């Protein structure tokens, strides 16, 4: 309880009290924080894992470490104020987040000093520090810095205090002079309800005055770390070079994260010189405070729990190399790192295009009455939406169709701003869409309103006037000025707290290029760097580069590719291309005594800044912009010395493409810098004249010149399917044979199954081939979306199924207008289009004059309007020529001109008709002669064919008879066997016949199966050639044609596929020596995808491909390094098995036994000379028919094209007047007739029809009555 007693814990609850005794006169002073960046070793600022630290392992962990790049300089020694008193800081409270790292000075005085000055350390964690959960750590000698004896201190006390409900004084601190006595106020820490559950104190020895502390909140505990005592001089150098790791100290239960921290200060009392504090007035101490961040680290521990070494995996290439290899001492070599990464380099915002629209400030401050509300239109400009949203004291904001947050971040086609005042009742009704006098007679919103209603407070006591008559439409206003004056004069005063200003913001969705965009903090365009961008509302991540080849349409700001991706933007009349960021793998060349060399694989140095993310650390950022970078075939190399004239034949750090990192000079690691690696050329057989072949040297021919050749290759892929009637084939028509065949069981069924198997093999093989030949297609449906003012109709032409359809006037129009149709030689339709599509109508008659074969023509039809026009012109010109001295007679010229042109039109039409009539007559007569001749020749040919066909029919009859005799012979032979043999002997002979035929049939079916298997194999070969030769370029020589394959074209052929292979074949060769491998300096080398050759008259080995002789230097890219120069030979034995010879047999005995009692006499009456193979010769007739057809084709009449010209003439006005008068008169007559006859009249009981000849005497019922027998009884 020592700490609580010393601090004077009180049970009073109040705001934060003062920390020092009232007798201390201290002047408050503002507390200023500064920031700096300190380079520190990772091992000095990381917080080790307390559970693994004593394992002595090297492993990769996610641990917390101090972010020294943004170190806070926290002053804790306010200056003295001379004899009038001291100063005290209003110390800052800083956020804690995950935790804090602190480096502090405890003391400055050596043991021999008699100044007795001190700078104790103290920190308090909490939130509000009033009735709050608080944790305090203090490092101060004796009694919280109040010395009990005047002597230098070599020990300090550690005070730990945790309270769940306490209040800490406002600016905690210590006195700078130790022997000052008690200076802390009694209520510096107030404990409410004895809530302090941790209160520990212990002592530690003091070695130096500087120490590092770290505080980490984790799982409801406060973990405390500390370093050893640090040297007081050259603080930053010791942090970056020395080894001062932190170790875990202890854990305090605090019940959760405490979000804020306040550090204690060291003050100088008033009248310091008189009281001994004057010896401590010149000290100026700052705490170095850094926040903790979680990083991916590689950490190596000692067995005592301290950190031996550590590396931040994202800090630099060297640090990441340690993490990749898992070692702090990897062997020399080139190692792949992760992909080029971290954060985006910057942000580009461009939103403003037009001029600036000035907001109506004065109207918003003093809005008009609702009856005379004010409207402002915003179009093609930049507008500050915050003026009407954020800058006004909002009472209520409600938006429709748009989020209030996005209102000031989007562009719109136009913005309408209506401003007025409104009272509370009308405002609620407007928001709830309740009709009242405001919405009915003053201002009404449309049903599809898109925008925001912003009601804001007014500081005004002006009267409030609304109209209550004359309804308005949405967006409309009162138009009667006298009524408006009356309303305004009758305005009544309302308390200003019940009247609000109303801004109605109506938005139109963005369309086109003239937009209203919000004011934003536009940035400078960052080029050739990976950035996030917001370009006129279009957001994304990419690289902006100036591009003069992109074309952006007029009035537009973007251009897109064929796939719809935005690829260009116009900013301030400059065109920029938008390209995606790149991501590339990075490699590092490592040597322990040299700086790390970086290789950006496959990336040019100008594109390093285009990586997806700009690196976090300073070292990675420097690598992305370093000037000492070199473009190589392998990529961009950074941080090396270029030696492109140096060639080495051994390389420990190859980077590909015959390039290598080497340590070109003897380097010694020092504390300041390391030499750089050198980039040189790598040739493993450089100066290989001493290289020896590993195998015998052979002479080979390598092509040097080629020619293109075409090869045809046919592959049969299918065969005809065969069906066999097994029983008929074996026995014919013999019933005795069929009986014997029954003893063979399922032989015929097996034969049919085998044939079915053949068909299945052929079908499956053909199906697989068809699948390989087939090409999958799909319909590409493009959906066009037309928004805004874009109109693509002119580009796309006619769309839909009715394109090109002729339109006609309706039947009603045919009834109302007269039509005249005449023949059009080709100029009348164009004349009518000229009249209809331009201004002026009939006045443009002569302007629309057409030309036909060099002659000016006009249609011969003149409408009444045109006739009246020319007549009045002619009459006026003639009549006025007398008193105008003949000048107006020029008006006759248009009349005469149009008359001549119309006569030309009649003449042209007549001439074309005459020419067409001559062509028709001549061609028709020619056609009749040729048709008659053709029919004659056809008749002769048919007669000849009839004679030949009749002869063939007779011969066919003879053939059928002879075939019948032949088939009967088979049955006769079998029947003869049965007639000579009896019983078993006969059946045995038949059995031998059946066996023989079965063997033949089995052999045939086997051949069919073999043929089907061959077809299947051919199908597989064809499919392989389609896949390798047609769909790709084969690398196999002579597989797709003869030579090196270029292109193959497949064609379907009968029962197969025909390939046309194009390949280039050698015509000339180089005769050179080659070896399978070379040995140089005890290392073996083999060629990779080629061969080593020794050109004639040289002693230097080279490399060339086998397809083309092009010797180049041997390099790492075309060479495989072997483990040794020895060759392993393997001998393969093979044995050829000779087929065994079958045993001999006496064929004559078998033959004699079979034909022992068999008669072989057969009456063959077949005579092939009985057939007359006559042929039909109709060549002459066919040739004649061809000539006739050609003559008929020549008789085609090429008529002059005559269109039908249709002219619609409207009736004169007097005809329409007479027609309307007639219709009106007819209607009046019908009505009059109906009224006079009272027959079906609508004036009498609503169409109460009666007989026209009936009685008409009736009376109106004035009173209620009952009618009986046509009499009325009241």
Curated annotation (Swiss-Prot):
Post-translational modification: Specific enzymatic cleavages in vivo yield mature proteins. The precursor is processed into S1 and S2 by host cell furin or another cellular protease to yield the mature S1 and S2 proteins. Additionally, a second cleavage leads to the release of a fusion peptide after viral attachment to host cell receptor. The cytoplasmic Cys-rich domain is palmitoylated. Spike glycoprotein is digested within host endosomes.
Extracellular side: 12-1212
Region (Heptad repeat 2), start-end ranges: 1162-1201
InterPro entries listed in its UniProt record: bCoV_S1_N, BETA_CORONA_SPIKE, CoV_S1_C, S2_sf_CoV, Spike_N_sf, Spike_S1_N_batCoV-HKU9-like, Spike_S1_RBD_bCoV, Spike_S1_RBD_sf_bCoV
Annotated site location: Cleavage: 676-677, 809-810
Motif (KxHxx): 1273-1274
Protein name: Spike glycoprotein
